[in-house]
Design a protein with these regions (language model features):
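A broadly conserved detector of short glycine/acidic/proline-rich loop/turn motifs that flank catalytic sites
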Residues: 5, 50, 110-112
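Short, well-ordered, mixed-charge alpha-helical segments that flank or form enzyme active sites
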Residues: 26-30, 52-54, 80-83, 116-117
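A contiguous pocket-lining binding segment that forms or flanks enzyme active sites
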Residues: 37-81
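Residue-level signal for the start and early helices of compact helical domains
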Residues: 25, 29, 34, 47, ...
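Fold-independent oxyanion-binding glycine-rich loops
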Residues: 21-24, 47, 77, 109-111
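Short, glycine/charge-rich flexible loops or terminal/linker lids adjacent to PRPP-binding catalytic cores
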Residues: 2-43, 54-57
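PRPP-dependent phosphoribosyltransferase catalytic core
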Residues: 62-145
Length: 145
């Protein structure tokens, strides 16, 4: 996801450094968990989805540990899940919790409400997926803020 964003920004004349973190540290090749440019200055976190916000919190810790500043978060899909953890669930969303806790903006391309609107739209593009509407609605009723 980050590489495709960097490519498109480059096409717009914006040559920005980028990096990503591996889930597991490797002891060969480049080693470590950060691949790409060193983390310096203000860093935008890019992720495919936000659920509880755990990976965002981990990314913020990695950025700070490297002396950089988390500037914001861009995500493809906000699942609109309640924030908190296994012991304590909040009534606010994980996105709202991240924004409040770290004082950074979180923006998404789409959220679960958008997905449900698409599934219920009756459009030709949605026809293949309408069978999932009930399951997505049940998920939203159970887990979302």
């Amino acid at each position: 996801l980050v590489a495709s964003i960097a490519i498109n920004l480059s096409r717009l004349g914006l040559d920005l450094p980028w990096a990503f973190n591996r889930k597991e540290k490797k002891d060969h090749g480049e080693g470590g968990t950060i691949i790409g440019s060193p983390l310096t200055g203000r860093v935008l976190i890019v992720d495919d989805v936000i659920s509880a916000g755990t990976s965002i919190r981990e990314s913020i810790a990695i950025i700070r540990d490297n002396g950089a500043i988390p500037a914001g978060v861009a995500i493809a899909l906000d699942r609109m899940e309640k924030g908190g953890n296994a012991e304590e669930v909040t009534e606010t969303s994980a996105v709202q919790d991240v924004e409040k806790t770290f004082s950074i903006p979180v923006v998404s391309i789409a959220n679960l409400t958008n997905l449900l609107e698409f599934l219920k739209s009756g459009s030709d593009a949605a026809q293949e997926f309408t069978s999932h509407t009930e399951a997505v609605t049940a998920y939203r009723n159970r887990y979302c803020a």
